[in-house]
Amino acid sequence: MRSVHFVALGDSLTEGVGDPAGDVWRGWAALLAGGLAEAGQVEFTNLAVSGAQTRDVLERQTPAGLELRPDLVSVVIGVNDTLRHTFDIHAVTTRLDEVYAAFTRQGTTLLTACLPDPGAMLGLPGALARPLARRQRAVNEVVHSLSDRYGAVHLHASGGTWLTDRALWSADRLHPGERGHRQLAVRFHALLADAGLATGRPPSPEPEFPTPSRSASLLWLATAGTGWVARRCTDLLPQLMRLAANELRHRAWGTSSRLDLHASAAVSEALAALSTPDQPEGGSADAGAQRRRTATNRTGVPGTACAAAGRSAAPTTAITG
């Protein structure tokens, strides 16, 4: 029996931050890999790097991943883009489209996810949190649309009760702990199994290692965790202050909805500017269309419907079930 090759692209979430296994990070992708096929029939390569943005995935991780010609590739990325002053939804859209298209041309199955708003996870005040939330919603809308466009197996992980279950999250409040990583792996496995793409035993939702003590978590947050947040947010802070001031002005004038409309329009323009996707190697237009029609998200709703539903789908699509 031919082995299944799974390649993971992304940032610290996919690298496994929050799920230590000995002296290294493990994470949801490694946990998922063990359930894709029977023991000894899976090859797993994790190319994710902490701090990566969509540019890094396109320029560095994708070429390395394409050389491996995987059967399955996960592309879970975008939060770090929202934490930079250079955030540009047009650039994010173009990069993700190029990454998805490159693997689709090889006939590789795409695995994607939309992600929580970092401002809400950090518990930032409203005026600071809303600009970040608007950015993350924009990224998620793009991921929804492109996942449908390329027939990806997509997990809606941006909302629901799992976001407020502290047992699932690490001390930094941005990364899942072991339980959270296991929840991601379990839910991704369920989607792949439904599509006939995972035949191994699903990952266990129960942790393998003891939960870090409160003192250990606080020590990590005060040292490595604080540094992690600072490195990713320092260049954003001056701009975030300006965004917050703008947020407060619009709120005082009763025109906050204009900011949301502007963000939605930018997403629509970015998606409209994309060219028609290429077909897989040896594939046909009909085959590509069939993949897009049959791709489903966590709720079993076709990708286009989930994208249209947007935030209203979040409460019923949490990955904690």
Each model region followed by its residue ranges:
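Oxyanion-hole/transition-state-stabilizing segment in secreted/luminal serine hydrolases
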Residues: 15-19, 54-91, 117-118
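Conserved catalytic region of serine esterases and O-acyltransferases that act on ester linkages
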Residues: 149, 172, 179-321
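Serine-esterase "nucleophile elbow" of acetyl-processing enzymes
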Residues: 1-50, 60-69, 270-283, 288-290, ...
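Alpha-helix N-cap and loop-to-helix initiation/capping positions
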Residues: 23-24, 87-92, 127-135, 172, ...
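Structural beta-sheet core signal
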Residues: 8, 75, 111-112
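A short helix->loop->beta-strand "cap" motif at the edges of active sites that frequently abuts
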Residues: 105-109
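Residue-level recognition of beta-strand->loop/alpha-helix junctions
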Residues: 46-48, 114, 156-159
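Substrate-gating cap/lid alpha-helix
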Residues: 122-156, 178
